[in-house]
Amino acid sequence: MRILIITGLSGSGKSTAVRALEDEGFFCQDNLPVMLFPTFVELVDKAKERVRDVALVMDIRGRDFHAGYEKVFQEISEAGHFVEILFFDATDEVLIRRFSETRRRHPAMESGSVPEGIRYEREQLAGLRRLATMIIDTSELNVHQLRELVISHVKGNHGGREMTIHLQSFGYRYGIPLESDLVMDVRFLPNPYFVPELKEFSGLNPNVRDYVLKYEETRIFLNKFKEMLEFLLPGYRREGKSYLTVSIGCTGGRHRSVVITEEMRDFFRTKQLNLNVSHRDMKKGLEK
């Protein structure tokens, strides 16, 4: 069976992810003690109605959640099941705003404030975060975008047989995506922002694309970036990595990073990989 461990910060979107997984046919179980995970998986595996996909929610609400979970995951894997850990995260600012909007109490709050609860929860979940197969930063995602991302992941990655690539552009002005495995800074490339007739367009505009790609330094960079990935991808496959997030950033995330991300889209398409492409910050500036 395929076992997804759903974990992460309170308010980061785990409930949305679970609902999306249920719609995709996953058998989902919330608030189960960690030490019972192997027994639960064994019972489901022996059920008359064959279940292939299971999602188990694991978070700070389970007071024993940090008790021997590495051994538990290993036990499930050794029983022949494929285990993935999806860790949902968001910035403190976004989490605080979400709790304020919903008027929910943070589960880690005793007598302290929401920020203190978030800080405590981050400390408690740090070990799980390091083990995560995939870290999903939901700070800039709405419910529909998060749902789409989760569904795209589970449909594209069946039992780890193929690697899924998430290729995204971003703006350093808004922060590096937390879930990044590889980050490429393209702020050294010629900037269409300073060309009056191009400034208000995005990197999807043909004229902006032509401007960025006409420079020799851009072409040299693309060749070297592709050469590096040609070297890295087989190594990641040998390691058994099932999901790779490649983030490409420029200052505002609207021009250069979008152009380069679209160019790399064509490169990854030739590699017979599952590919998701997004432009996180492209719409945060003026666009035509």
UniProtKB/Swiss-Prot annotation:
TM region positions: none
InterPro entries: P-loop_NTPase, RapZ-like, RapZ-like_N, RapZ_C
GO molecular function terms listed in the Swiss-Prot or TrEMBL record: ATP binding; GTP binding
Disulfide bridges in this chain: none
Keywords: ATP-binding, GTP-binding, Nucleotide-binding
SUPFAM superfamilies xrefs: P-loop containing nucleoside triphosphate hydrolases (SSF52540)
Residues that hold ATP according to the record: 8-15
Entry binding sites for GTP: 59-62
HAMAP family membership: RapZ_like
Main function: Displays ATPase and GTPase activities.
Family: Belongs to the RapZ-like family.
Stored PANTHER family: RNASE ADAPTER PROTEIN RAPZ
Protein name from the UniProt record: Nucleotide-binding protein Gura_2968
Organism classification: Bacteria, Pseudomonadati, Thermodesulfobacteriota, Desulfuromonadia, Geobacterales
